[in-house]
């Protein structure tokens, strides 16, 4: 049960109702502070729709954060989003292998992106070696977008956990295929 109410469009001022187009519990809770919700949505919208970073790399990084932090909401939502941009079941299984320190079938760049996401999630910063490995393949713009994407989703999982935002039933199906360790 969420710690703040989920608001419906009729409960908020008309000028903020556009923020509920996605009709997710996250957005319904964030509109308790509509201007903050708009700022949050601006960053999330840029990451998803404005950035020219390879969307598969973006989603692998986000999935890594969600998996590491055992964020059911984040992980399941981004499995669905990731599939829409080319993330395969083999990619998700490879991410799980990489997380456990086992070899995977991923190419070096996606492997390095996952490692960078792990380092930022659990160690605050990406190591020099990982940063250099990724940077050898990405422009300055894409490197900036990647780092800010990982940082943003590290924040998102903390918002989801602190606010105890409930996952929508249609996303729980993902957990049958990819159960999060330690999450029931």
Residue ranges and their predicted role:
Residues 1-184:
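Hydrophobic alpha-helical segments
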């Amino acid at each position: 049960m969420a710690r703040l109410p989920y608001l419906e469009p009729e409960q908020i001022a008309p000028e903020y109702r556009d923020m509920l187009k996605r009709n997710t519990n996250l957005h319904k809770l964030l509109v308790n502070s509509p201007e903050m919700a708009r700022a949050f949505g601006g960053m999330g919208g840029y990451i998803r729709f404005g950035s020219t970073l390879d969307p598969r790399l973006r989603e692998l990084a986000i999935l890594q954060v969600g998996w590491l932090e055992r964020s059911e909401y984040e992980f399941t939502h981004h499995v669905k989003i990731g599939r829409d941009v080319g993330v395969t079941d083999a990619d998700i299984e490879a991410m799980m292998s990489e997380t456990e320190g086992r070899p995977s079938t991923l190419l070096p760049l996606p492997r390095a992106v996952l490692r960078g996401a792990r380092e930022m999630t659990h160690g605050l910063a990406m190591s020099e070696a990982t940063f250099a490995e990724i940077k050898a393949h990405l422009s300055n713009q894409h490197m900036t977008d990647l780092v800010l994407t990982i940082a943003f989703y590290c924040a998102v999982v903390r918002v989801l956990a602190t606010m105890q935002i409930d996952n929508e039933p249609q996303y729980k199906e993902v957990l049958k295929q990819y159960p999060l360790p330690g999450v029931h």
